[in-house]
Every structure is written in C-alpha cells, then in structure tokens.
Amino acid sequence: MAGTPHIMIVESRYYEEIAQHLIDSVLKELSDAGARYERFEVPGAFEIPAAIGFALEASKLESNATAYDGFIGLGCVVRGQTTHYDYVCGESARGLQDLALKYSAAIGYGILTVENRDQALARARRDGFSWNCDSFDDA
C-alpha cells in the first residue's frame, strides 16, 4: 500500500461503555500509524460483516465508491440465557473470515465475545487494540 492507509471502522455501540473503550484504543493505534479512517455504526455485531461486505462489493462495482485499505469490526456480545449468543458470535466471526478470504481483505476482528459485563470491561480496557492491528502492517 502506498501512501496513508484508509481504514473503515464498523462498530456496534450496543454496550456503549465497552464500545467507547474499544474505539478509543483503535483510534489511538490508527493515529499512531498515521492512518485515515471513517466510522460507521451498526445496531449489533451480527450486522458488522454485512456493512463491510457492502463496502467491499461497492468498491469492486462502482468506480466512484470509497476504497479502503483495511477494515476493523468492533463490538461486544455478552452471553445471555438463550442460544442467540452462539449464533451471533459464530456468524459474525464466520462472516468476517469469509469476506477476508473472498476479497483478500485485511480485516481486524475486534468483537469481544464474553460471559458478562465485567469480563467485557476487563478485555476492552486491556492493552489497547494493538493485538489486532498487525494485519494492517502488510495491507
């Protein structure tokens, strides 16, 4: 990639406090890397792959569509009392992996899958998002 990387961030802010910790660490990493970014919000983690997929498909089909060098999906899924958690976690991960393979796209997976709010906060507050930004070094 030549020049300044342009990153699409797709975030679910369903759990506002957790989402804020995640985006703060991502924006710090992108700022440190000198990257440009655009943020898009979706209702939940399940919708993150679709939003990224729409952008990838648009850039392939439309000459005036915004082209991104990489993508970051951010969200949090907390286990509840039904199987909904399993479906959302599995399908959001599978959806992003399928997109990465189909389009040879650099996609950072920043969707926390946790048992409870305390665990989510502990993971969201940890050492930033650097654990997931290495994929953009080679984008």
Task: Enumerate the predicted regions with their spans.
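Glycine-rich phosphate-binding loop
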Residues: 51-96, 100
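N-terminal presequence-like segments and the immediate start of the first folded domain
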Residues: 1-6, 130-134
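Short, well-ordered secondary-structure micro-motifs
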Residues: 20-21, 49-53, 82-86, 119-123
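Glycine-rich phosphate/diphosphate-binding loop of Rossmann-like nucleotide-binding domains
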Residues: 2-39
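Short beta->alpha junction loops
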Residues: 37-47
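Short beta-strand segments at enzyme active-site cores
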Residues: 39, 68-74, 106-113
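C-terminal binding/interaction regions
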Residues: 85, 90-139
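Short, ordered loop/turn segments at secondary-structure junctions
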Residues: 13-14, 42, 75-77, 112-117
